[in-house]
Amino acid sequence: MVMVLSPLLLVFILGLGLTPVAPAQDDYRYIHFLTQHYDAKPKGRNDEYCFNMMKNRRLTRPCKDRNTFIHGNKNDIKAICEDRNGQPYRGDLRISKSEFQITICKHKGGSSRPPCRYGATEDSRVIVVGCENGLPVHFDESFITPRH
């Protein structure tokens, strides 16, 4: 009986090693955050950019009123969730210590169904994000920092 169980047990244990580990829920939320708000190196930051990005990222069913795209390095954005580039801000939110290049896309009105028309505003701002397990998962807002 032990001889029969040993090969079965061995196959079971080997099978566990081959089973892919599913990404954590936090990873999905982080990926969703990147899909909605991250564009490393934008090509132009005008109304056409907003039209294409909102459409390609599937943020137009219905037309989203406003969306902000953050440009730059993902690691700098992740660092907002740590003390390297972020600090506590209102509850569980974090505010960046450095500014990021951003593009704000605002729906110009009209129908809430595609094709959606957007106006673009480009700027450099500090940003506020919500973090879970060291990863940004929610974009809250951005601020223009005072120039000295």
Curated annotation (Swiss-Prot):
According to its UniProt entry, the protein's GO biological process terms are:
actin filament polymerization; angiogenesis; antibacterial humoral response; antimicrobial humoral immune response mediated by antimicrobial peptide; cell differentiation; defense response to Gram-positive bacterium; innate immune response; negative regulation of smooth muscle cell proliferation
List of catalytic residues: 37 (proton acceptor), 138 (proton donor)
Motif extent (Nucleolar localization signal): 55-59
The entry's localization annotation reads: Secreted; Nucleus; Nucleus, Nucleolus; Cytoplasm, Stress granule
Superkingdom classification of source: Eukaryota
Q: Name one GO molecular function term.
A: copper ion binding
Q: Where would you say this protein principally sits, based on its record? A: secreted
Q: What class does this enzyme belong to in the EC scheme?
A: hydrolase
**Which interval of the chain is the signal sequence?**
1-23
Could you tell me which cysteines form disulfide bridges?
50-105, 63-116, 81-131
Stated EC number for the protein is: 3.1.27.-
Q: Where does tRNA bind?
A: 45, 105, 127
Write out the tissue specificity statement of the associated record. Serum and milk.
Q: Name one GO cellular component term.
A: nucleolus
Which of UniProt's keywords are assigned here? Angiogenesis, Cytoplasm, Developmental protein, Differentiation, Disulfide bond, DNA-binding, Endonuclease, Hydrolase, Nuclease, Nucleus, Protein synthesis inhibitor, Secreted, Signal, Stress response
Query: What PANTHER family would the database entry show?
Result: ANGIOGENIN, RIBONUCLEASE
Entry function: Secreted ribonuclease that can either promote or restrict cell proliferation of target cells, depending on the context. Endocytosed in target cells via its receptor PLXNB2 and translocates to the cytoplasm or nucleus. Under stress conditions, localizes to the cytoplasm and promotes the assembly of stress granules (SGs): specifically cleaves a subset of tRNAs within anticodon loops to produce tRNA-derived stress-induced fragments (tiRNAs), resulting in translation repression and inhibition of cell proliferation. tiRNas also prevent formation of apoptosome, thereby promoting cell survival.
Q: Which family does it belong to?
A: Belongs to the pancreatic ribonuclease family.
Q: What is annotated about its quaternary structure and interactions?
A: Homodimer. Interacts with RNH1; inhibiting ANG ribonuclease activity.
**Which protein are we looking at?**
Angiogenin-1
Provide the species name: Bos taurus (Bovine)
Q: What is the lineage of its organism?
A: Eukaryota, Metazoa, Chordata, Craniata, Vertebrata
